[in-house]
Protein backbone atom coordinates (compact mmCIF):
# COMPACT_ATOMS: atom_id res chain seq x y z
CA UNK A 1 0.00 0.00 0.00
CA UNK A 2 2.88 2.36 0.77
CA UNK A 3 4.21 1.68 -2.72
CA UNK A 4 0.90 2.63 -4.35
CA UNK A 5 0.42 5.66 -2.09
CA UNK A 6 3.92 6.92 -2.87
CA UNK A 7 3.40 6.33 -6.58
CA UNK A 8 0.17 8.35 -6.60
CA UNK A 9 1.52 11.25 -4.51
CA UNK A 10 4.83 11.85 -6.26
CA UNK A 11 7.05 9.97 -3.82
CA UNK A 12 9.30 6.99 -4.44
CA UNK A 13 8.90 3.85 -2.38
CA UNK A 14 9.67 1.22 -4.97
CA UNK A 15 10.94 -1.21 -2.37
CA UNK A 16 7.41 -1.35 -0.99
CA UNK A 17 6.51 -3.55 -3.95
CA UNK A 18 8.75 -6.23 -2.41
CA UNK A 19 5.92 -6.91 -0.01
CA UNK A 20 4.62 -9.24 -2.71
CA UNK A 21 7.73 -11.41 -2.36
CA UNK A 22 7.21 -11.64 1.40
CA UNK A 23 3.56 -12.48 0.79
CA UNK A 24 4.43 -15.38 -1.53
CA UNK A 25 6.89 -16.84 0.99
CA UNK A 26 4.30 -16.54 3.76
CA UNK A 27 1.70 -18.15 1.50
CA UNK A 28 3.82 -21.28 1.05
CA UNK A 29 4.61 -21.38 4.76
CA UNK A 30 0.97 -21.11 5.85
CA UNK A 31 -0.35 -23.70 3.39
CA UNK A 32 2.29 -26.21 4.40
CA UNK A 33 1.89 -25.75 8.14
CA UNK A 34 -1.92 -25.65 8.18
CA UNK A 35 -2.27 -28.71 5.94
CA UNK A 36 -0.01 -30.62 8.31
CA UNK A 37 -2.01 -29.65 11.38
CA UNK A 38 -5.47 -30.10 9.89
CA UNK A 39 -6.40 -32.90 7.51
CA UNK A 40 -8.13 -31.55 4.42
CA UNK A 41 -9.04 -33.04 1.04
CA UNK A 42 -8.01 -31.34 -2.21
CA UNK A 43 -11.63 -30.41 -2.96
CA UNK A 44 -12.13 -28.97 0.53
CA UNK A 45 -8.92 -26.98 0.22
CA UNK A 46 -9.87 -25.43 -3.13
CA UNK A 47 -13.44 -24.75 -2.00
CA UNK A 48 -12.23 -23.03 1.16
CA UNK A 49 -9.79 -20.84 -0.77
CA UNK A 50 -12.43 -19.96 -3.37
CA UNK A 51 -14.92 -18.92 -0.69
CA UNK A 52 -12.34 -16.63 0.85
CA UNK A 53 -10.86 -15.12 -2.31
CA UNK A 54 -13.41 -15.06 -5.12
CA UNK A 55 -16.57 -13.20 -3.97
CA UNK A 56 -14.86 -10.05 -2.70
CA UNK A 57 -12.42 -10.01 -5.62
CA UNK A 58 -15.28 -10.25 -8.10
CA UNK A 59 -17.03 -7.40 -6.31
CA UNK A 60 -13.93 -5.19 -6.45
CA UNK A 61 -13.43 -6.04 -10.13
CA UNK A 62 -17.09 -5.23 -10.76
CA UNK A 63 -16.60 -1.81 -9.19
CA UNK A 64 -13.67 -1.19 -11.55
CA UNK A 65 -15.71 -2.25 -14.57
CA UNK A 66 -18.69 -0.13 -13.52
CA UNK A 67 -16.42 2.85 -12.89
CA UNK A 68 -14.80 2.47 -16.30
CA UNK A 69 -18.19 2.26 -18.03
CA UNK A 70 -19.26 5.40 -16.15
CA UNK A 71 -16.15 7.26 -17.32
CA UNK A 72 -14.50 7.44 -13.90
CA UNK A 73 -11.39 5.61 -15.08
CA UNK A 74 -10.66 7.11 -18.52
CA UNK A 75 -7.37 5.23 -18.89
CA UNK A 76 -8.98 1.83 -18.34
CA UNK A 77 -9.80 0.09 -21.61
CA UNK A 78 -12.28 -2.76 -21.28
CA UNK A 79 -12.70 -5.82 -23.46
CA UNK A 80 -14.94 -8.78 -22.69
CA UNK A 81 -12.03 -11.19 -23.08
CA UNK A 82 -9.87 -9.31 -20.59
CA UNK A 83 -12.68 -8.91 -18.05
CA UNK A 84 -13.44 -12.64 -18.17
CA UNK A 85 -9.76 -13.51 -17.88
CA UNK A 86 -9.54 -11.23 -14.86
CA UNK A 87 -12.56 -12.78 -13.16
CA UNK A 88 -11.24 -16.31 -13.63
CA UNK A 89 -7.63 -15.53 -12.69
CA UNK A 90 -6.17 -16.21 -16.13
CA UNK A 91 -3.09 -14.08 -16.87
CA UNK A 92 -3.80 -11.87 -19.88
CA UNK A 93 -2.42 -8.68 -21.36
CA UNK A 94 -4.31 -5.55 -20.43
CA UNK A 95 -5.68 -3.62 -23.43
CA UNK A 96 -4.96 -0.48 -21.42
CA UNK A 97 -1.21 -0.94 -21.10
CA UNK A 98 -0.10 -4.18 -22.72
CA UNK A 99 1.11 -5.39 -19.32
CA UNK A 100 0.00 -8.76 -17.96
CA UNK A 101 -2.47 -7.27 -15.51
CA UNK A 102 -6.11 -7.96 -14.67
CA UNK A 103 -8.75 -5.22 -14.59
CA UNK A 104 -7.98 -4.68 -10.90
CA UNK A 105 -4.23 -4.31 -11.33
CA UNK A 106 -3.13 -5.57 -7.93
CA UNK A 107 -5.02 -8.78 -8.69
CA UNK A 108 -1.98 -10.00 -10.65
CA UNK A 109 -0.70 -11.54 -7.43
CA UNK A 110 -3.88 -13.62 -7.18
CA UNK A 111 -3.10 -15.13 -10.58
CA UNK A 112 0.01 -16.58 -8.94
CA UNK A 113 -1.89 -17.57 -5.82
CA UNK A 114 -4.36 -19.57 -7.92
CA UNK A 115 -1.44 -21.49 -9.41
CA UNK A 116 -0.16 -22.15 -5.91
CA UNK A 117 -3.60 -23.30 -4.75
CA UNK A 118 -4.08 -25.62 -7.72
CA UNK A 119 -0.65 -27.25 -7.45
CA UNK A 120 -0.84 -27.54 -3.67
CA UNK A 121 -4.33 -29.06 -3.86
CA UNK A 122 -3.02 -31.58 -6.38
CA UNK A 123 -0.18 -32.47 -4.03
CA UNK A 124 -2.71 -33.39 -1.33
CA UNK A 125 -3.51 -36.50 -3.36
CA UNK A 126 0.04 -37.70 -2.67
CA UNK A 127 1.68 -39.13 0.43
CA UNK A 128 3.01 -36.34 2.62
CA UNK A 129 6.68 -37.13 2.02
CA UNK A 130 6.18 -36.75 -1.73
CA UNK A 131 4.51 -33.35 -1.67
CA UNK A 132 7.42 -31.01 -1.09
CA UNK A 133 9.78 -32.68 -3.60
CA UNK A 134 7.07 -32.87 -6.28
CA UNK A 135 5.93 -29.25 -5.90
CA UNK A 136 9.55 -28.05 -5.75
CA UNK A 137 10.48 -30.06 -8.83
CA UNK A 138 7.48 -28.84 -10.81
CA UNK A 139 8.10 -25.18 -10.03
CA UNK A 140 11.82 -25.49 -10.69
CA UNK A 141 11.05 -27.12 -14.05
CA UNK A 142 8.71 -24.24 -14.93
CA UNK A 143 11.37 -21.66 -14.11
CA UNK A 144 13.98 -23.52 -16.16
CA UNK A 145 11.52 -23.74 -19.06
CA UNK A 146 11.04 -19.99 -18.85
CA UNK A 147 14.78 -19.50 -19.14
CA UNK A 148 15.17 -21.91 -22.04
CA UNK A 149 12.05 -21.19 -24.10
CA UNK A 150 11.14 -17.70 -25.33
CA UNK A 151 7.45 -17.79 -24.39
CA UNK A 152 5.15 -15.08 -25.71
CA UNK A 153 1.95 -16.41 -24.16
CA UNK A 154 0.81 -14.42 -21.11
CA UNK A 155 0.05 -17.55 -19.10
CA UNK A 156 3.47 -19.12 -19.63
CA UNK A 157 5.29 -15.81 -19.18
CA UNK A 158 3.58 -15.53 -15.81
CA UNK A 159 3.95 -19.07 -14.54
CA UNK A 160 7.60 -19.50 -15.49
CA UNK A 161 8.84 -16.50 -13.51
CA UNK A 162 11.36 -17.26 -10.73
CA UNK A 163 8.99 -15.60 -8.26
CA UNK A 164 7.07 -18.90 -7.97
CA UNK A 165 10.08 -20.37 -6.15
CA UNK A 166 9.30 -18.03 -3.24
CA UNK A 167 6.24 -20.17 -2.56
CA UNK A 168 8.43 -23.27 -2.47
CA UNK A 169 10.80 -21.50 -0.10
CA UNK A 170 7.87 -20.82 2.20
CA UNK A 171 6.93 -24.51 2.18
CA UNK A 172 10.50 -25.48 3.06
CA UNK A 173 10.55 -22.95 5.91
CA UNK A 174 7.25 -24.43 7.09
CA UNK A 175 8.75 -27.92 7.20
CA UNK A 176 11.63 -26.69 9.35
CA UNK A 177 9.13 -24.87 11.58
CA UNK A 178 7.09 -28.03 12.11
CA UNK A 179 10.24 -29.90 13.10
CA UNK A 180 11.12 -27.18 15.61
CA UNK A 181 14.25 -26.24 13.71
CA UNK A 182 14.14 -22.47 14.13
CA UNK A 183 17.27 -20.27 14.28
CA UNK A 184 18.20 -19.01 17.75
CA UNK A 185 17.32 -15.44 18.64
CA UNK A 186 20.72 -13.98 17.79
CA UNK A 187 20.72 -15.57 14.33
CA UNK A 188 17.09 -14.66 13.69
CA UNK A 189 17.70 -11.05 14.70
CA UNK A 190 20.71 -10.91 12.37
CA UNK A 191 18.69 -12.34 9.47
CA UNK A 192 15.91 -9.85 10.12
CA UNK A 193 18.36 -6.93 10.18
CA UNK A 194 20.20 -8.18 7.09
CA UNK A 195 16.97 -8.48 5.13
CA UNK A 196 15.90 -4.93 5.96
CA UNK A 197 19.37 -3.63 5.18
CA UNK A 198 19.38 -5.56 1.92
CA UNK A 199 16.06 -4.07 0.85
CA UNK A 200 17.42 -0.59 1.57
CA UNK A 201 20.63 -1.26 -0.37
CA UNK A 202 18.75 -2.30 -3.52
CA UNK A 203 17.88 1.33 -4.17
CA UNK A 204 21.16 2.74 -2.89
CA UNK A 205 23.31 0.47 -5.06
CA UNK A 206 20.97 0.53 -8.04
CA UNK A 207 20.55 -3.24 -8.07
CA UNK A 208 17.93 -4.82 -10.33
CA UNK A 209 14.55 -4.69 -8.63
CA UNK A 210 13.19 -8.16 -9.34
CA UNK A 211 12.54 -11.44 -7.59
CA UNK A 212 16.16 -12.51 -8.01
CA UNK A 213 17.18 -9.80 -5.54
CA UNK A 214 14.04 -9.31 -3.46
CA UNK A 215 13.15 -13.02 -3.22
CA UNK A 216 16.14 -14.14 -1.11
CA UNK A 217 15.72 -11.08 1.12
CA UNK A 218 12.05 -11.95 1.63
CA UNK A 219 13.06 -15.47 2.67
CA UNK A 220 15.55 -14.07 5.21
CA UNK A 221 12.90 -11.70 6.55
CA UNK A 222 10.35 -14.47 7.10
CA UNK A 223 12.92 -16.74 8.80
CA UNK A 224 14.01 -13.86 11.00
CA UNK A 225 10.47 -12.99 12.06
CA UNK A 226 9.68 -16.64 12.80
CA UNK A 227 12.77 -16.83 14.99
CA UNK A 228 11.67 -13.71 16.86
CA UNK A 229 8.20 -15.19 17.33
CA UNK A 230 9.51 -18.56 18.50
CA UNK A 231 11.64 -16.77 21.09
CA UNK A 232 8.73 -14.75 22.44
CA UNK A 233 9.67 -11.41 20.91
CA UNK A 234 6.44 -10.95 18.94
CA UNK A 235 3.43 -10.03 21.05
CA UNK A 236 -0.18 -10.46 19.99
CA UNK A 237 -1.74 -6.98 19.82
CA UNK A 238 -5.29 -6.12 18.83
CA UNK A 239 -4.50 -3.52 16.14
CA UNK A 240 -1.96 -5.64 14.23
CA UNK A 241 -4.41 -8.53 14.59
CA UNK A 242 -7.18 -6.48 13.01
CA UNK A 243 -4.90 -5.33 10.20
CA UNK A 244 -3.93 -8.96 9.59
CA UNK A 245 -7.55 -10.08 9.47
CA UNK A 246 -8.42 -7.22 7.13
CA UNK A 247 -5.28 -7.54 4.99
CA UNK A 248 -7.06 -9.10 2.01
CA UNK A 249 -9.73 -6.40 1.94
CA UNK A 250 -7.07 -3.70 2.38
CA UNK A 251 -5.17 -5.25 -0.52
CA UNK A 252 -8.25 -5.19 -2.77
CA UNK A 253 -9.73 -1.80 -1.91
CA UNK A 254 -6.85 0.49 -0.93
CA UNK A 255 -6.16 1.74 -4.45
CA UNK A 256 -9.66 3.18 -4.75
CA UNK A 257 -9.18 5.36 -1.67
CA UNK A 258 -5.60 6.28 -2.56
CA UNK A 259 -6.61 7.49 -6.04
CA UNK A 260 -9.39 9.68 -4.63
CA UNK A 261 -7.19 11.17 -1.90
CA UNK A 262 -4.30 11.81 -4.30
CA UNK A 263 -6.58 13.73 -6.68
CA UNK A 264 -8.20 15.62 -3.80
CA UNK A 265 -4.82 16.55 -2.35
CA UNK A 266 -3.67 17.88 -5.70
CA UNK A 267 -6.90 19.86 -6.14
CA UNK A 268 -6.68 21.62 -2.76
CA UNK A 269 -2.92 22.11 -2.85
CA UNK A 270 -2.13 19.75 0.01
CA UNK A 271 1.57 19.02 0.37
CA UNK A 272 2.90 15.72 -0.92
CA UNK A 273 3.88 14.29 2.51
CA UNK A 274 0.47 15.11 3.98
CA UNK A 275 -1.27 13.69 0.92
CA UNK A 276 0.68 10.46 1.17
CA UNK A 277 -0.15 10.13 4.88
CA UNK A 278 -3.83 10.75 4.16
CA UNK A 279 -3.73 8.26 1.28
CA UNK A 280 -2.21 5.50 3.43
CA UNK A 281 -4.67 6.18 6.25
CA UNK A 282 -7.68 6.21 3.92
CA UNK A 283 -6.52 3.06 2.13
CA UNK A 284 -6.23 1.27 5.46
CA UNK A 285 -9.59 2.50 6.73
CA UNK A 286 -11.50 1.59 3.57
CA UNK A 287 -9.95 -1.88 3.72
CA UNK A 288 -10.97 -2.36 7.35
CA UNK A 289 -14.48 -1.11 6.57
CA UNK A 290 -14.74 -3.49 3.61
CA UNK A 291 -13.58 -6.36 5.80
CA UNK A 292 -16.16 -5.64 8.48
CA UNK A 293 -19.07 -4.92 6.15
CA UNK A 294 -18.36 -7.28 3.23
CA UNK A 295 -15.69 -9.91 3.70
CA UNK A 296 -16.39 -11.00 7.28
CA UNK A 297 -20.19 -11.27 6.83
CA UNK A 298 -19.69 -13.28 3.63
CA UNK A 299 -17.28 -15.64 5.39
CA UNK A 300 -19.63 -16.09 8.34
CA UNK A 301 -22.56 -16.77 6.04
CA UNK A 302 -20.53 -19.39 4.20
CA UNK A 303 -19.54 -21.09 7.45
CA UNK A 304 -23.16 -21.08 8.65
CA UNK A 305 -24.30 -22.73 5.42
CA UNK A 306 -21.63 -25.44 5.73
CA UNK A 307 -22.63 -26.14 9.32
CA UNK A 308 -26.31 -26.32 8.36
CA UNK A 309 -25.54 -28.62 5.44
CA UNK A 310 -23.44 -30.85 7.69
CA UNK A 311 -26.18 -31.12 10.30
CA UNK A 312 -28.76 -31.87 7.62
CA UNK A 313 -26.53 -34.58 6.18
CA UNK A 314 -26.05 -36.25 9.56
CA UNK A 315 -29.79 -36.03 10.27
CA UNK A 316 -30.54 -37.74 6.96
CA UNK A 317 -28.21 -40.58 7.91
Curated annotation (Swiss-Prot):
Query: So which domain of life are we looking at?
Result: Bacteria
Write down the InterPro entries for this protein, in alphabetical order: Acyl_transf_3_dom, Acyltransferase_3
Q: Which UniProt keyword terms apply here?
A: Cell membrane, Exopolysaccharide synthesis, Membrane, Nodulation, Plasmid, Transmembrane, Transmembrane helix
The protein's matches in Pfam families, at most eight in alphabetical order, are given as: Acyl_transf_3
Q: Where in the cell is it found?
A: Cell membrane
Primary location = membrane
Please provide the Gene Ontology terms (biological process) for this protein: polysaccharide biosynthetic process
Role: Required for the acetyl modification of the third sugar (glucose) of the octasaccharide subunit of succinoglycan (EPS I).
Indicate what this protein is called per its UniProt record: Exopolysaccharide production protein ExoZ
* Species of the source: Rhizobium meliloti (strain 1021)
Q: Which gene encodes it?
A: exoZ
Amino acid sequence: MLFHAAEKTGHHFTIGAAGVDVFFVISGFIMWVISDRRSVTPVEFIADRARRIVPVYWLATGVMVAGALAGLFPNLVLTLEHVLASLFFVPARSPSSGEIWPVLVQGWTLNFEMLFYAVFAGSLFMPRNWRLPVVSGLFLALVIAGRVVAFDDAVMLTYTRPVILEFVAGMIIGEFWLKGRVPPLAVGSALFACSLGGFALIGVLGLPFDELTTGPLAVLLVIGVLSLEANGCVRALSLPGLLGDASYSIYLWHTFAISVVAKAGLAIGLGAPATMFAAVLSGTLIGIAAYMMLERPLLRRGRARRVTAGLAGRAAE
